[in-house]
Design a protein with these regions (language model features):
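RNA/tRNA-interacting regions in translation and RNA-turnover enzymes
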Residues: 1-220
């Protein structure tokens, strides 16, 4: 999917943006309004920023590609690229047709809402009306972390969204400053990537074309 942020004023959705470079992203407010799983009015009239991920279900990608194949259009490569391209469309009607979804992950400035842990934040986001990924687990030790990784590595093919790993976070927010940050990322979170899927393909032919500058380019 594509990282996104949603801003609410008095409980009303008023700004949506992509993560961009971490400081400045694209304003995609109009397009995010087309995402049914993103609440437009919260259950509480608060000012809040919530970060998450906009994604396309694998079943939706298959459905869209079947339609595009019948219409003689190029197929969408994968759910991740399809979600990013769909969210950035200039025409929000096209975005709506792509049937995007959103998972909420992060409550910005949780102390303002008396939320003290990651698990409590996810529960709070659900009460506000957000779509929270049900596949999150509270682990008590490293053995449970390893068990969870192995479980979802074996289950990921059955999920209706593409995933290449798991994010592991310290649960207690008051430990974050103590644990600290590197120049680019926090030390209290780490992304574990599943082993890459390996497939075998047959190369039937190579066609050489000459580019504008005279460079010879091989095409499989």
């Amino acid at each position: 999917g594509i990282a996104s942020t949603a801003h609410y004023k008095s409980g009303m959705f008023n700004l949506g943006a992509t993560r961009g470079n971490g400081q400045v992203g694209e304003n995609v407010t109009t397009n995010m309004l087309t995402i049914n799983s993103l609440p437009k009015i919260l259950t509480s009239p608060i000012d809040v920023e919530v970060r998450g991920e906009v994604y396309m279900k694998k079943s939706v990608l298959d459905e869209l590609n079947e339609e595009r194949k019948n219409d003689g259009l190029p197929l969408l490569a994968n759910p991740r690229n399809a979600a990013g391209g769909s969210l950035r469309q200039l025409d929000p009607n096209i975005t709506k047709q792509r049937k995007l979804d959103q998972f909420a992950y992060t409550l910005v400035n949780p102390e303002k809402y008396n939320v003290k842990t990651q698990m409590d934040a996810l529960d709070y986001l659900k009460t506000l009306g957000f779509n929270v990924n049900p596949n999150h687990v509270h682990c008590n030790d490293i053995e449970e972390v390893i068990e969870t990784i192995e479980k979802y590595d074996s289950l990921r093919k059955t999920l209706d969204y593409a995933t290449d790993g798991i994010v592991i976070k310290v649960n207690e927010f008051d430990l974050y400053d103590t644990i600290g940050y590197t120049v680019k990322v926090p030390k209290w979170a780490i992304a574990y990537k599943f082993p890459a899927e390996v497939v075998t393909t047959r190369l039937n032919d190579i066609i050489f074309t000459i580019g504008r500058t005279g460079k010879i380019i091989p095409n499989a």
